[in-house]
């Protein structure tokens, strides 16, 4: 029979009607001579009741045979429950079963299909189709669908054109490693899966599309963590003839619309702006979490004359104050913080506590000459813990920024009901790579430098600033964008500054440079990480929870066993030979 409605949508107004439902058995129990069955579908649970005294014998026999996750079809009459269950949307009603059919049976599942499941991540991913049956997972994907629907409507209303860009592209240097796809037709040659549609969307601006968007899959072969996956989805925008403020206004409107439609939250516009330098100096991060205080304090000048070599000779000495929680940190727990700090390049972690009105701790004896001034500068009060890092400014900022976030989580200092958006602006164009031994793009090689710093492309690259902007939410980079270079000579200078010879620049980006000979308009754009945005809206801490079939931390899929070896014949067609490390 045709399904009448979803089980999770049956309500009191349906009492007295005969309906047909289809779904999975969540559980079955015998109670007081009656058989109760919880039927689950996409929209929720509905209680079914079989009374052996007045039900058909075949129905009773079928009901007795049911096990969890059997797929069933049931027809019956909606009745009011004797005792309502206020914890269920369908809790005021139940279905008196007249007909019951098993559509498919099920083996015992490797974990119970319910929220709060106790199973390893790999087990959940190995049986992802079962994991996705759980109500909280279904809700995540309903939220994701609503977010993308809202985004499309908003951008369509602003006359953006949805354009699909190629998945098989050219491998280019800079950024993360590419995923490569060998060509059978042009043997020895490779496509790359796009890390972003950056160049193609710029070319669409040269084509006169004016406003482009795409909700697009991107690929990066990089080390994984909770907010990264090898394949991910971004909301990609590009516009012509708009400045950075206008692009930011469009983005803020989009985010405000999503927040209103999906969470019922009114966000205040415009979002706060913070320079990159202020973010690093005050928060120790280019994606600051502003839901709590504990800002970094610069003590370099204050401690330069103390009788403590580590402080006196360090290029920078900075500190954070953990207010009112010193008693929660024993020497052992501070040693753990020290080990954590060393992961970010710090040689160690100095500390003092305010106990009975005086500073105490391993370095307190070196600070007696400045104790009063230090206490005043940092506003140290009873039971405060002060953590110091003495090192280069970069290491001090990065280490204390990471400690700030770690301690806030440990002490439950973060208000998880807040959505704190902000823009980080005034970015450096380049960042130094110790691994590469050279400057690399902080964003990408097509970012427009500020007019007053462009001359340094042939000078001190550390002084070149970018017309770039990142949008941050609760300590996560939600997205980033910039104005782009549209002048050929400036693009050539940028590539030269990055170490490209003229020959290599044209070999890699000749098609883009050639396009700049044909009236390339001023343009700029932005990309938002859709997976990360939905993760934060759903209150999750791993984007695997909002991606239907994600990879694990080894970039593998435990369900399909991808990546896998392929047949020798396939390799021969591609003129490839694979040598494994253990051969």
Swiss-Prot record:
Region listing for Aspartate, in residue ranges: 198-201
Listed InterPro entries: Aa-tRNA-synt_II, aa-tRNA-synth_II, aa-tRNA-synth_II/BPL/LPL, Asp-tRNA-ligase_1, Asp-tRNA-ligase_1_N, Asp/Asn-tRNA-synth_IIb, AspRS_core, GAD-like_sf
Residue sites binding ATP per the record: 220-222, 229, 477, 529-532
Localization of this protein: Cytoplasm
Major location category of this protein: cytoplasm
Catalytic activity: tRNA(Asp) + L-aspartate + ATP = L-aspartyl-tRNA(Asp) + AMP + diphosphate
EC number: 6.1.1.12
UniProt entry keywords in alphabetical sequence: Aminoacyl-tRNA synthetase, ATP-binding, Cytoplasm, Ligase, Nucleotide-binding, Protein biosynthesis
SUBUNIT field: Homodimer.
Similarity-based family: Belongs to the class-II aminoacyl-tRNA synthetase family. Type 1 subfamily.
Annotated binding of L-aspartate, by residue: 174, 220, 443, 484
GO cellular component, one term: cytoplasm
One GO term of the biological process aspect: aspartyl-tRNA aminoacylation
Annotated GO MF terms: aspartate-tRNA ligase activity; ATP binding; catalytic activity, acting on a protein; nucleic acid binding; transferase activity
Gene3D superfamilies in the record: Bira Bifunctional Protein, Domain 2, GAD-like domain, Nucleic acid-binding proteins
Biological source species: Streptococcus thermophilus (strain ATCC BAA-250 / LMG 18311)
Protein name in the entry: Aspartate--tRNA ligase
Function recorded in the entry: Catalyzes the attachment of L-aspartate to tRNA(Asp) in a two-step reaction: L-aspartate is first activated by ATP to form Asp-AMP and then transferred to the acceptor end of tRNA(Asp).
């Amino acid at each position: 029979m045709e399904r009448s409605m979803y089980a999770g949508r049956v309500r009191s107004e349906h009492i007295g009607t005969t309906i047909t439902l289809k779904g999975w058995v969540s559980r079955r129990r015998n109670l007081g001579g009656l058989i109760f069955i919880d039927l689950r579908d996409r929209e929720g649970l509905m209680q079914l009741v079989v009374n052996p005294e007045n039900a058909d014998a075949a129905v009773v026999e079928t009901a007795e045979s049911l096990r969890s996750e059997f797929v069933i079809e049931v027809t019956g009459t909606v009745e009011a429950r004797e005792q309502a269950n206020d914890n269920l949307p369908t809790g005021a009603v139940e279905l008196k079963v007249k007909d019951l059919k098993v559509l498919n049976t099920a083996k015992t599942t490797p974990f119970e299909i319910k929220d709060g499941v106790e199973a390893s991540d790999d087990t959940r991913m190995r049986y992802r189709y079962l994991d996705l049956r759980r109500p909280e997972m279904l809700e995540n994907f309903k939220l994701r669908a609503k977010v993308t629907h809202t985004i499309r409507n908003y951008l369509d209303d602003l006359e953006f054109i949805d354009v699909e860009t190629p998945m098989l592209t050219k491998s280019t240097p800079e950024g993360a490693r590419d995923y490569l796809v060998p060509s059978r037709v042009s043997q020895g040659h490779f496509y790359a899966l796009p890390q972003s549609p950056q160049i193609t969307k710029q070319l669409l601006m040269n084509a006169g599309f004016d406003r482009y968007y795409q909700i697009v899959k991107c690929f990066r072969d990089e080390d994984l963590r909770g907010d990264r996956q090898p394949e991910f989805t971004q909301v990609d925008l590009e516009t012509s003839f708009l400045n950075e403020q206008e692009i930011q206004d469009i983005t803020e409107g989009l985010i405000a619309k999503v927040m209103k439609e999906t969470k019922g939250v009114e966000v205040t516009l415009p979002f706060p702006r913070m320079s990159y330098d202020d973010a690093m100096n005050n928060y120790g991060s280019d994606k600051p979490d502003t839901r709590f205080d504990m800002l970094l304090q610069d003590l370099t000048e204050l401690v330069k004359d103390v009788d403590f070599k580590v402080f006196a000779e360090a290029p920078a000495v900075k500190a954070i104050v953990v207010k009112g929680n010193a008693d929660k940190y024993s020497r052992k727990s501070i040693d753990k913080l020290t080990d954590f700090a060393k992961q970010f390049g710090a040689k160690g972690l100095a500390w003092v506590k305010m106990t009975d009105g005086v500073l105490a701790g391993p370095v307190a004896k070196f600070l007696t000459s400045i104790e009063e001034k230090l206490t005043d500068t940092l506003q140290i009060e009873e039971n405060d813990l002060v953590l110091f890092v003495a090192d280069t400014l970069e290491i001090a900022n990065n280490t204390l920024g990471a400690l700030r976030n770690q301690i806030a989580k440990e002490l439950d200092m973060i208000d998880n009901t807040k959505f704190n958006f902000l823009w980080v602006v005034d970015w450096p164009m380049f960042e130094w790579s110790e691994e590469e031994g050279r400057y690399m793009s902080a964003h990408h090689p097509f970012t427009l430098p500020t007019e007053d710093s462009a001359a340094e492309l042939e000078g001190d690259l550390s002084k070149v600033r970018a017309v770039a902007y990142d949008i941050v939410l609760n300590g996560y980079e939600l997205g980033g964008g910039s104005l782009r270079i549209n002048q050929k000579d400036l693009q050539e200078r940028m590539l030269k500054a990055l170490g490209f010879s003229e020959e290599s620049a044209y070999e890699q980006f000749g098609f883009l440079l050639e396009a700049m000979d044909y009236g390339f308009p001023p343009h700029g754009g932005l990309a938002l990480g859709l997976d990360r945005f939905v993760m934060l809206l759903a209150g999750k801490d791993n984007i695997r929870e909002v991606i239907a079939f994600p990879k694990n931390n080894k970039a593998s899929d435990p369900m399909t066993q991808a990546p896998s070896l392929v047949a020798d014949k396939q390799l021969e067609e591609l003129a490839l030979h694979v040598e494994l490390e253990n051969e």
